[in-house]
Design a protein with these regions (language model features):
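Glycine-rich beta-strand-centered segment in the early N-terminal region that forms part
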Residues: 6-54, 108, 132
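A general structural signal for well-ordered alpha-helical segments in protein cores
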Residues: 28, 86-89, 158-161
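Short alpha-helical patches at coil-to-helix transitions and adjacent helical residues
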Residues: 24, 28, 82-86, 114, ...
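C-terminal hydrophobic helical "lid"/dimerization subdomain
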Residues: 4-10, 151-185
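Mid-domain Rossmann-like dinucleotide-binding core that forms the NAD(H)/NADP(H) cofactor-binding site
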Residues: 83-142
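NAD(P)H/NAD(P)+-dependent Rossmann-fold oxidoreductase cores
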Residues: 122-123, 127, 131-132, 142-152, ...
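NAD(P)H dinucleotide-binding glycine-rich loop of Rossmann-like/cofactor-binding domains
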Residues: 47-109
Length: 185
């Protein structure tokens, strides 16, 4: 674990963050301190950022551009469970336009992405089917690249995922077990 003394004060455009939970590609935590010229973030704000695979200490430094604000009505469990797969589901739903009442088949090798994409399609009025359909929404590399194309798109996508969580779109989708996701006390 990294102690408070070994993590320096944040510099220009950098945030010092205290992680609270990690899962499915994202870490959620709170702002511990904000460096000069950081706009929109203050100490104790809830935030999320992409997990880089590194060991996470008690405090970490991240560029402000790599951090997303988390609304107060979204839990840590919802962020780590739904944000990553939700961004992919959002991109998949946007790849093929469909209308209310259309039959849609969802194809993904990731069961959680398939379940979340189906839930999102149903919330937009589609009938999700396992057989022949008006169109198929396929989880492929091109669609996933749309998710990671840039921070502006990531931030915009995160807002839509958080709104879908608030509307209850993913209520039927089981979250990640929180006991395996905790990173800090």
């Amino acid at each position: 674990m990294t102690s408070t003394r070994t993590v320096p004060r944040p510099t220009l455009g950098v945030l010092r963050l205290r992680p609270t939970m990690r899962g499915r590609g994202f870490v959620v935590g709170v702002v511990d301190a904000a460096g000069p010229d950081t706009n929109g973030f203050a100490p104790k704000d809830r935030v999320a950022w992409r997990a880089g695979g590194e060991q996470i200490g008690e405090l970490v430094l991240r560029e402000q551009r790599d951090v997303l604000g988390v609304p107060h009505w979204v839990t840590d469990e919802q962020v780590v469970s739904y944000l990553g797969p939700g961004l992919i589901a959002r991109a998949l739903v946007r790849t093929r336009p469909f209308g209310r009442g259309d039959d849609v088949r969802v194809e993904s090798s990731d069961p959680l992405v398939a379940e979340m994409t189906a839930a999102w399609a149903r919330s937009l009025g589609a009938r999700v089917v396992d057989t022949k359909a008006d169109l198929a929404i396929r989880d492929d590399l091109r669609s996933r690249r749309a998710v990671v194309a840039g921070h502006g798109r990531l931030a915009e996508g995160a807002v839509e995922v958080f709104q879908a969580i608030r509307r209850g779109v993913f209520d039927s989708v089981e979250p990640v077990a929180p006991a395996t996701s905790r990173v800090a006390a």
